[in-house]
Amino acid sequence: MRPWTGSWRWIMLILFAWGTLLFYIGGHLVRDNDHPDHSSRELSKILAKLERLKQQNEDLRRMAESLRIPEGPIDQAPASGRVRALEEQLLKAKEQIENYKKQTRNGLGKDHEILRRRIENGAKELWFFLQSELKKLKNLEGNVLQRHADEFLSDLGHHERSIMTDLYYLSQTDGAGDWREKEAKDLTELVQRRITYLQNPKDCSKAKKLVCNINKGCGYGCQLHHVVYCFMIAYGTQRTLILESQNWRYATGGWETVFRPVNETCTDRSGTSTGHWSGEVKDKNVQVVELPIVDSLHPRPPYLPLAVPEDLADRLVRVHGDPAVWWVSQFVKYLIRPQPWLEKEIEEATKKLGFNIPVIGVHVRRTDKVGTEAAFHPIEEYMVHVEEHFQLLARRMQVDKRRVYLATDDPSLLKEAKTKYPTYEFISDNSISWSAGLHNRYTENSLRGVILDIHFLSQADFLVCTFSSQVCRVAYEIMQTLHPDASANFHSLDDIYYFGGQNAHNQIAIYPHQPRTADEIPMEPGDIIGVAGNHWDGYSKGVNRKLGRTGLYPSYKVREKIETVKYPTYPEAEK
């Protein structure tokens, strides 16, 4: 008897068992027709699992064929190795099937999640609208009307918090919360593997590279976003990002003295040819491309925010309320991995400040932004939203203390906040506020301070700030990497979220609207609206691109238009 014969019989037995498992799964799929609601929810996931099983079955078939060597001398060792590999693959398949059988749900459908978020947004927009209108009424008549208006606002707030609490529990029911947790983790790990693969090519001397200089003339948050923009272009054009950060205005030793290097194996920018950015197609044969700041970028590639990868879009829409922010956050996550000394510094600051949850993060930007990019907002404006969210948190958790992490560049604000709100516990480091002043801003101590502020703001349960500040937006982005979906965990006193240099932010009308005042614009379902901002009173401002008219429209009558781009998928990262 030839030595391969026993192995071949064993292979046939494995394939038979594999076929039986496929038949078993198929049988479950057929039986699920008796429960159409459950089947429709599970169908796409089951089909995906079956497709993977079929692929593994095909792999087994090819491995079996490689063992069928009818002529020539036989080497028993490789055959035994292949058999062991088959055994391991079969065991893994059995584990996958057992896990699948135990899993009662795999999350809800995309439409369910979109509707849930629409209800949530609609309730919030209704609240903003009623608050605004009733506050106007308070000034029209005497004390009686004012008292009734106050009571009505209080009752209305109670209703709104009840709706939001119910929606939260809806999002966690029937295993949906567990599914969202796992799906977000899987997506994050997938993207981080792809980035790591791109940043560490096998042969650095032959790799295509994109060079980015960190020293854009602006503050830390702005410079970090500059590097994120470079990274997204590098990822889209399949070029390894080379970050030039020597003589960084915050740390002369460069980025790597604070954060882990963006590359482990490829830090050299040298190449056979070098050129300035002239477009993905024109730069095809240029090995090293230098990228300008986004303000000077021409031509503009499709990889800029707010676009997301086409291959991930459907999964992202299901799991996250703002896929564009999630996508940006993945590059931030990779970039700000701390060096050991910084990690230790964060741990020590956490203990020293007594940072604990629940806590709401408040970022108050004064100094250079006020009067230029942002208006002045008193602490009372922030605390209204802090109080509202603590009342909401109290519906679903024990709130032992009402803690607020206060980050500001105004050293006098901490004392003011403590005086005006004695029932709150304010966590803050005034030395950071002093270091954030204009005269101290570009120092290593200032860098330490802004990193700590952003860290603690991102760790909060909710964020109240002005999105005109890059520090606030960075904290919000990092927050997305700490939760499956933290897209709604903020209130901005001014702008909606944006990324400097982004492409147009568009929405799609889902309800018709007829203007009641000259300030409003008409809409029909399907109209594309270029959004300029949310007034947080039930109305947003934008342009109806079909009509070319700019004005106000009810925020609840539109939905976000998700822009997708055919990014590379880096299959090599999975090998």
UniProtKB/Swiss-Prot annotation:
GT23 domain ranges (all copies): 206-493
Pfam families, alphabetized: FUT8_N_cat, SH3_9
GO molecular function ontology, one term from the record: glycoprotein 6-alpha-L-fucosyltransferase activity
Phosphoserine modified-residue sites: S278
Residue spans, topological domain Lumenal: 31-575
Transmembrane segments: 10-30
GO cellular component annotations of the record: Golgi cisterna membrane
This protein's UniProt keywords: Disulfide bond, Glycosyltransferase, Golgi apparatus, Membrane, Phosphoprotein, SH3 domain, SH3-binding, Signal-anchor, Transferase, Transmembrane, Transmembrane helix
Protein name: Alpha-(1,6)-fucosyltransferase
Organism: Canis lupus familiaris
Lineage, highest ranks first: Eukaryota, Metazoa, Chordata, Craniata, Vertebrata
Gene transcribed to yield this protein: FUT8
